[in-house]
């Protein structure tokens, strides 16, 4: 039976941390051995007390690594990976809701040749214009992921990675596009990266135009940061695939496409 570590980086997630922990513990884990849940936390809100109370009420092994000052996502990922004892590490953002079979789907695709399995993030349905923009972008991303391996394959909301491979990777402090960095590293080591459309993880879409814009800007800044660091990105998305899938998704979600321009 494969041993698995769940890792959750968190920062001020008092409204979400209990939900993600319950989602993980009560999910379909019949064919895997969940040896531990590691939370790397920089919170200044009530997240620590909520986690500690949760630990008292549940028998699963939970390791809570708390920092009194904010050290960032890269430090959290490094902490989780270096402390993991499972053969496979499954990383979840603290504000997502994995479907019951998501962990199992992420674990099942890892083997001797596959180093990373990317999840299939899906925004929760919402009728707001910013949310519809998020939904359209996500539909386009899912569409291109199904067509080819690219810089958009691995998204940080949820992924699985072989522990022995992950422990050879040190994520630079302050890095934004951690998911793309890790994908490139794994490909550079000669392992495959796969996308599993059945590994569904739900997330809340942007509620305001400011939130939507900040998400887009952060993604752009993350890619530009890697360029400035002169880090080589493998498997660029082809222009043909990008355009074909854009028009394909627009045909079925024209309002969503329009929402990205408002």
Over which residues does each language-model region extend?
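A conserved acidic beta->alpha catalytic loop
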Residues: 23, 40-49, 69, 96
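Glycine-rich, basic loop-to-helix element that forms the pyrophosphate-binding segment
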Residues: 67-84, 181
């Amino acid at each position: 039976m494969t041993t698995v570590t769940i890792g959750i980086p968190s920062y001020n997630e008092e409204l979400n941390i209990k939900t993600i922990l319950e989602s993980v513990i009560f999910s379909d884990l019949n064919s895997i051995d969940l040896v531990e849940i590691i939370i790397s936390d920089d919170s200044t809100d009530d997240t620590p007390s909520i986690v500690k109370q949760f630990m008292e009420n549940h028998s699963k092994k939970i390791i809570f690594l708390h920092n009194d000052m904010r050290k960032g996502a890269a430090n959290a990922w490094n902490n989780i990976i270096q402390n993991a004892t499972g053969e496979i590490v499954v990383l979840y953002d603290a504000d997502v809701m994995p479907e019951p079979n998501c962990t199992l789907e992420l674990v099942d695709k890892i083997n001797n040749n596959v180093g990373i399995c990317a999840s299939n993030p899906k925004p929760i349905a919402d009728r707001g214009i910013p949310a519809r923009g998020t939904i359209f972008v996500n539909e386009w991303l899912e569409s291109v992921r199904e067509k080819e391996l690219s810089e958009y394959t691995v998204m940080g909301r949820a992924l699985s990675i072989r522990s022995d491979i992950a422990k050879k990777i040190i994520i630079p402090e302050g890095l934004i596009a951690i998911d793309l960095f890790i994908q490139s590293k794994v490909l550079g080591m000669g392992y495959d990266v796969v996308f599993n459309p059945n590994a569904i993880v739900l997330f809340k879409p942007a509620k305001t135009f400011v939130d939507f814009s900040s998400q887009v800007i952060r993604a752009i800044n993350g890619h530009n940061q890697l360029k400035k660091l002169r880090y080589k990105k493998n498997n660029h998305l082809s222009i043909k695939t990008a355009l074909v899938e854009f028009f394909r998704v627009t045909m079925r979600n024209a309002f969503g496409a329009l929402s990205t321009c408002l």
